[in-house]
Amino acid sequence: MGNTTTKFRKALINGDENLACQIYENNPQLKESLDPNTSYGEPYQHNTPLHYAARHGMNKILGTFLGRDGNPNKRNVHNETSMHLLCMGPQIMISEGALHPRLARPTEDDFRRADCLQMILKWKGAKLDQGEYERAAIDAVDNKKNTPLHYAAASGMKACVELLVKHGGDLFAENENKDTPCDCAEKQHHKDLALNLESQMVFSRDPEAEEIEAEYAALDKREPYEGLRPQDLRRLKDMLIVETADMLQAPLFTAEALLRAHDWDREKLLEAWMSNPENCCQRSGVQMPTPPPSGYNAWDTLPSPRTPRTTRSSVTSPDEISLSPGDLDTSLCDICMCSISVFEDPVDMPCGHDFCRGCWESFLNLKIQEGEAHNIFCPAYDCFQLVPVDIIESVVSKEMDKRYLQFDIKAFVENNPAIKWCPTPGCDRAVRLTKQGSNTSGSDTLSFPLLRAPAVDCGKGHLFCWECLGEAHEPCDCQTWKNWLQKITEMKPEELVGVSEAYEDAANCLWLLTNSKPCANCKSPIQKNEGCNHMQCAKCKYDFCWICLEEWKKHSSSTGGYYRCTRYEVIQHVEEQSKEMTVEAEKKHKRFQELDRFMHYYTRFKNHEHSYQLEQRLLKTAKEKMEQLSRALKETEGGCPDTTFIEDAVHVLLKTRRILKCSYPYGFFLEPKSTKKEIFELMQTDLEMVTEDLAQKVNRPYLRTPRHKIIKAACLVQQKRQEFLASVARGVAPADSPEAPRRSFAGGTWDWEYLGFASPEEYAEFQYRRRHRQRRRGDVHSLLSNPPDPDEPSESTLDIPEGGSSSRRPGTSVVSSASMSVLHSSSLRDYTPASRSENQDSLQALSSLDEDDPNILLAIQLSLQESGLALDEETRDFLSNEASLGAIGTSLPSRLDSVPRNTDSPRAALSSSELLELGDSLMRLGAENDPFSTDTLSSHPLSEARSDFCPSSSDPDSAGQDPNINDNLLGNIMAWFHDMNPQSIALIPPATTEISADSQLPCIKDGSEGVKDVELVLPEDSMFEDASVSEGRGTQIEENPLEENILAGEAASQAGDSGNEAANRGDGSDVSSQTPQTSSDWLEQVHLV
């Protein structure tokens, strides 16, 4: 039994169908035990009997195996099915007992394999869950991703290919080499089969095909120009003349003369005609037309169907010239002075001048030969009547008449600014540029704005610039294109081969000079990242100084120390050398940077130019490809398909490639790092992507893309091209606007709420004013030398609108004099000269703080809480009834204390913004009131008044205070304000006092400039507002002992030294006795935000 099985296997492997059939039929036991789906094992690459039968195209055995439950979907070690092996042909060679190659394959083998393939395609296997039967996998792929159609196409088996395609084989399947079945046939030189597959692929049916082709048919393919042939020019001229004549009710000759005088512009003619028709005709060399006769719809235009047209019109001339027979005998020619024969056809001129026919012919021939065909006037002296065209045609010969028509068309084109001749030598075509109408729809192609130098085509493929008549260079204008060509001439790019490498070398050299120093011995670059000035070269072991680059042995105590260098001359020389080298390296780097930038644009410019030259050949091959596809499809389906889409796609590709080529010179001259350039480059990249996609689909020996996909790609490229040109015509993007002044907000919403502002905009306005004020801090000289800007708005204009109501939200008050008085009295009491000297470091650190930092503002607020400011008993009781601030957006809990009715909720403490506004007001007052110098400050009476607010350290009242209070931040700030602006603190008026512009403060000397327009406004929600309102005044501020002291101080300043002593006696222990001793006392009085 084993010998029979072995013999049968060998017969299958060798392809001996007769021996295999004989063994199989003569051994019933083999027939019963043989399973066609059983693998022969690894030595035979796991092929089954069905694989070998399909490989050699054994019809009888293959049919038998399929009838005995053979499964053609079984796979071998290469993941190949029986259909793969059937379509392979004799090219595959398998060693050692596997498939042996056959040197020759007869033609009958193709038909036999086609029969085997048909049997496999008709095979039905087990019933599946969906009620269908298992079928042979026609698109099964092996390890190399080849389908049976790939192998059939590579083998050139046309019958098998047709069967596979008919049963739905995938024409677009790609193997691991990205080859389709058409590509496989092409590589094996089966050209007819490849062409057949190409036609099947291109004209394959798809659900999207009809929709895309409908869009392609509806696509507006018009361009903003029109190529005109000579007959088109003649028809355009005649149509324009006829329409104008019909509109003006004038003869054709008159209409032509009017149009010629107005540059063939109908709108221009109508404007002149409506203003003065007689003057318009006179300047054009024609007479004013009369109304047409009855039976005619216009002068010499279309005849009426009811009235026959006569050979000669009796109304040719406005002046009806009637000559008697006696006069005809005596008429003379005005040129030759000979009698005009009666037998000659008369030449009737509208002006009435008579000349013989011979003189007319000689005169007209001379004018036509001179090229003045469009302005031939009457030969009479001082007559400017134009000779009608019908007279010229009736007098001159046919050959001369032909030349006249040529000159006439030439004059029509040259006098029409909307038409230009094609500059290509030997081309007789012209181009008409379509004018863009303002009433065109936005979706119309012609509604796109025209470029300054559009590219036009005469219809023969001759592209040229409309403006300069040179090479087409849109989107560049003529001057930009000229500059680009000049740049190429100057740069000589053929000599700039290694620009990129040189640019990198220059950049490296600049970096080394900027970040390193050369060794003084071996000149190797050394970078210092840590350590002292004693350097040792790692290459030559040379010890040198990093500062002066000289030998380290020269350094000792004479140079400032062993690890310091104070050798000024040497250091100066080294720095000059380093600076010169750096400047030279920067120049070199900048030059190579410019060269590298030019090479970037020039390289891409040349790449697109080279691609354009290669793709121009597709115009010739596209026509051949169209004929081949039509012929191949006609043989298979019998129809003649539309193949013009290939040529259209090539034209779209060439137009876009040319625009991309010229877009790089346009981008080269754009402003670097501008919004306009960024938008341009984005659109340019987008256009390049769709263009390359279309090029891959079209620029192939065999098309492998369906027709509808090629059409879709071409439509997309055309759309992107039009959008790109329209964008460039509009200027790509508006000019970059200047950057507006930035007003930064705080990090989160809680910042401006926590700091007491009603909105982020109010906080931004505050920050802006803080940045633009005078920021010099220091002594009195620096304050007095920086007066405020007269154009800068005052605090009142910034905080209070014109209507008089505050812009702040409820619960946020402007600083009042009363509250500031309490604050000053409690803070400045703690300041003494001794304490100021002890806290000098704190004051220096404070002078460098940034007031705009929210963290600093928060620290000031917290310092208020810890400072324990003094308040009188009445004020403390009033503040204890403070309402909750949680309702205004703070993160603090609401107060549970009861709030007295009919009482406004005061603010417990100053917000950070109010504290900083206080500092601004103090500085502004100090700058405006500058009556003193630092020398006279101590001797002025104001210094005596200062002692009321700032008692000395020897004062017994101040000696008994807690020294820890002097360490708080707020006390230091107030002390600093006091030292810098001593006069400003004394000048703060009470809330109930308005300072007029004419009044002068007591601390100002005679002749000095007074403080003008100083008014402190108290809002309705002030913290010390009294319930009683007197008639004629606003809300009154609760009296305060410190206010009385200030008023007393003012009166004392006016009265003299005695008043100052009275003011000193007026201050006193009342304020100091109100000061809380601990922070807890202050927390009980004030609810701090």
Swiss-Prot record:
A lipid is attached at G2 (N-myristoyl glycine). ANK repeats lie at residues 45-74, 144-173. Residues 281-321, 776-821, 889-912, 927-964, 1026-1089 are annotated as: Disordered. A zinc finger (RING-type) spans 333-383, 519-548. A zinc finger (IBR-type) spans 401-478. Signal peptide: none annotated. Residues 575-640 form a coiled coil. Keywords: ANK repeat, Coiled coil, Lipoprotein, Metal-binding, Myristate, Phosphoprotein, Repeat, Transferase, Ubl conjugation pathway, Zinc, Zinc-finger. The active site is at C532. It comes from the Eukaryota. Zn(2+) 2 binds at C351, H353, C378, C383. Gene3D superfamilies: 1.20.120.1750, Ankyrin repeat-containing domain, Zinc/RING finger domain, C3HC4 (zinc finger). GO terms for cellular component: cytoplasm; ubiquitin ligase complex. GO terms for molecular function: ubiquitin conjugating enzyme binding; ubiquitin protein ligase activity; zinc ion binding. Zn(2+) 5 binds at C545, C548, H555, C565. One of its GO terms (biological process) is protein ubiquitination. Residues 851-870 form the UIM domain. Residues 329-569 are annotated as: TRIAD supradomain. It catalyses: [E2 ubiquitin-conjugating enzyme]-S-ubiquitinyl-L-cysteine + [acceptor protein]-L-lysine = [E2 ubiquitin-conjugating enzyme]-L-cysteine + [acceptor protein]-N(6)-ubiquitinyl-L-lysine. Members of the RBR family are atypical E3 ligases. They interact with the E2 conjugating enzyme UBE2L3 and function like HECT-type E3 enzymes: they bind E2s via the first RING domain, but require an obligate trans-thiolation step during the ubiquitin transfer, requiring a conserved cysteine residue in the second RING domain. Belongs to the RBR family. PANTHER family: RBR FAMILY RING FINGER AND IBR DOMAIN-CONTAINING (PTHR11685). Might act as an E3 ubiquitin-protein ligase, or as part of E3 complex, which accepts ubiquitin from specific E2 ubiquitin-conjugating enzymes and then transfers it to substrates. This is Ankyrin repeat and IBR domain-containing protein 1. It comes from Homo sapiens (Human).
